[in-house]
Amino acid sequence: MTFPARVREPDHVIPDILGPKLASILATPGVTDVLINGHEQVWFERAAGRLEPLKSPFETDGEIARLAQDLIASGGRHLDQANPFADVSIGAGIRVHAALASTCHPKTLISIRVHLDRHYGLQELSKTGMFGEIELDLLRTILRNRQNFLIAGAAGAGKTTLLRAMLSECPSERIIAVEDVGEIGLESGHFISLQTRQANNEGAGEITLDRLVREALRMRPDRIAVGEVRGAELLTMVQALNTGHSGGGATLHANSFESVASRLGAIGWQCRMPAEEMLNQVRAAIDWVIFVGVQGGARRVQRIGPLP
């Protein structure tokens, strides 16, 4: 299957750095993911649908490697044999992950995700069918009462979309987001995104999520949001939420509502903390778990409740 160069105005802004070949793919409305496996294989996906092959516009693997390095450099990071993996955000809502050809894989791999609904609020998400009026009222009550929440779900289920929409309900508050790659992107004048930094070629200069959470606490936040908790930053965040920093939110990868506790326990072990102790800390800090999933090709809030 091939795309025409332009069907209508795309759902997102396409940065010049992407180049004409990649831009022609991303210009097609509805595209959410483009996956490039060397110069011969290109796949695309439209809003929570299935992956479909696309005739590759690229000619050599060297072209893919240069494209990957240019994309990563445009996001302020570097990609080379010493650092063969990198993740950046470029333009308005485009996230790029690149893996340079190495012993891990013989070809350069590029994964691009486009956030089509970057500025949706809770009301707009409700109209798409992601949740109903009852859930809408509950989500707004959580925010109004400054309760802490954790949004869990699988990759592509809409965790960041929902987190962004919830935070957008608080335009007058100073919100500090801690992220690996800037994706939340609120338009509020009091929104700040702190992003991690990879180490340089000498192994120095790395800035982790855990470090950024600690720094955010010193910046007089009204709310703290963590783009994705998966390590020591979870403990730092819940300790902050347990000591007066209310109204915070974060996302977590999990396959079901019931598996959230085991995921958190596993993170505890990574932090050299017994799983039950980590769960006790989280239960004291997090008031609500919001689980999102994909049903029939559409994103849905499937359950809202206390940590199981």
Residue ranges and their predicted role:
Residues 136, 149, 165-285, 291-295:
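Switch/coupling sub-region of P-loop NTPases
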Residues 151-153:
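Hydrophobic anchor at the beta1->P-loop junction of P-loop NTPases
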Residues 20-24, 71-87, 173, 271-276:
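Active-site phosphate-binding and catalytic loops of NTP-dependent enzymes
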Residues 162:
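Hydrophobic positions on the alpha1 helix immediately C-terminal to the Walker A/P-loop
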Residues 43-45, 51-145:
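P-loop NTP-binding catalytic core
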